[in-house]
A protein has these predicted regions:
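Small/polar-rich, solvent-exposed N-terminal microdomains that initiate assembly or binding
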Residues: 1-56, 77, 88-89, 93-99, ...
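Generic short beta-strand segments
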Residues: 45-50, 108-109, 127-129
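Oligomerization/assembly interface segments of phage tail-like spikes and tubes
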Residues: 58-74, 119-131
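Short alpha-helix boundary/capping segments
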Residues: 74-81
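Short amphipathic alpha-helices in soluble, non-transmembrane regions
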Residues: 81-87
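Low-complexity, intrinsically disordered Gly/Pro/Thr-rich segments
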Residues: 102-115
Length: 133
């Protein structure tokens, strides 16, 4: 059985090991509080479902939204460039090996950039499926 927490950890590990995203700059999942200074990231995992297609014992589908938060007094291009590099990193077809499963991004959707109080926010949603080994 694939555990949701293990899938979350594998996605984070893949992101932190292959980009300039600093794990110390990850605001808590779904957190509304973001400390001052520099680029910060917020993640929210959503839409976890388990299906049982004929060719696999089970499959987990879900998505994660990554928001890149940047102080509004800085050039917004920095957040946009980082959002694009994250999108490129998870671009299908890609197969990420986990403990007892394979993780495959299926679709990447850039979300509209916005301003929220003192933050510029560039976001994207990564849809994925996880298959047992």
């Amino acid at each position: 059985m694939i555990e949701f927490q293990t899938v979350k950890l594998k996605i984070r590990e893949y992101l932190f090991s292959r980009t300039s995203v600093d794990s110390g700059h990850l605001a808590g999942e779904g957190s509304f509080f973001v400390p001052d200074g520099g680029l910060w990231f917020r993640e929210a995992f959503q839409e976890f479902t388990v299906t049982r297609p004929a060719q696999f014992s089970s499959r987990v589908d879900g998505s994660v939204v990554y928001e890149i938060l940047q102080p509004s007094d800085r050039d917004f291009r920095e957040a946009e460039v980082l959002r694009q590099s994250i999108a490129d990193l998870f671009q299908p077809p890609l197969l990420i090996s986990g403990e007892g499963f394979y993780l495959q991004p299926t679709r990447i959707v850039p979300l509209a950039s916005r301003l929220d109080r003192a933050w510029n926010i560039a976001a994207l949603r990564i849809h994925f499926s996880a298959y047992p080994v």
